[in-house]
């Protein structure tokens, strides 16, 4: 059930559906989860300042049932930051990503929980 949400001031029209699809594949591979469970939501065109300027910036979170935490997050961070920098042009020092390990009982899906 990995869910990646990311808000950025990069204009929405500069964020392609192909970028969302490649983000989905990246996350599935990083976490070893079936891509059929991965959800990606990128909120472009947001009013965001970072460090007092409105230069390209963003912040987000990756929620998952397992696969995140501790040293794993260093590797996840490196891969996600490179992907976001390459795809959206946001420098690594103008982003934050929170990694959240969810409990199955706290995640609803298809009328039940995991």
Swiss-Prot record:
The active site is at residue 2. One of its GO terms (cellular component) is extracellular space. It comes from the Eukaryota. Keywords: Cytokine, Isomerase, Secreted. Signal peptide: none annotated. It is an enzyme of class 5 (isomerase). Its main location: secreted. The keyword Secreted applies. It catalyses: L-dopachrome = 5,6-dihydroxyindole-2-carboxylate; 3-phenylpyruvate = enol-phenylpyruvate. The keyword tRNA-binding does not apply. Substrate binds at residues 33, 98. One of its GO terms (molecular function) is phenylpyruvate tautomerase activity. It is found in: Secreted. Its EC number is 5.3.2.1, 5.3.3.12. Belongs to the MIF family. Tautomerization of the methyl ester of L-dopachrome. Inhibits migration of human peripheral blood mononuclear cells. This is Macrophage migration inhibitory factor homolog. It comes from Trichuris trichiura.
């Amino acid at each position: 059930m990995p869910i990646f949400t990311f808000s950025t001031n990069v204009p929405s029209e500069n964020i392609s559906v192909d970028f969302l699809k490649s983000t989905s594949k990246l996350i599935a591979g990083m976490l070893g989860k079936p891509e059929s469970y991965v959800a990606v939501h990128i909120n472009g065109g947001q009013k965001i300042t970072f460090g007092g300027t409105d230069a390209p910036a963003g912040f987000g979170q990756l929620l998952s049932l397992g696969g995140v935490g501790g040293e794993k997050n260093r590797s996840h961070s490196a891969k996600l930051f490179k992907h976001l920098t390459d795809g959206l042009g946001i420098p690594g020092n103008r982003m934050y990503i929170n990694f959240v390990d969810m409990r199955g009982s706290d995640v609803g899906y298809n009328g039940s929980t995991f």
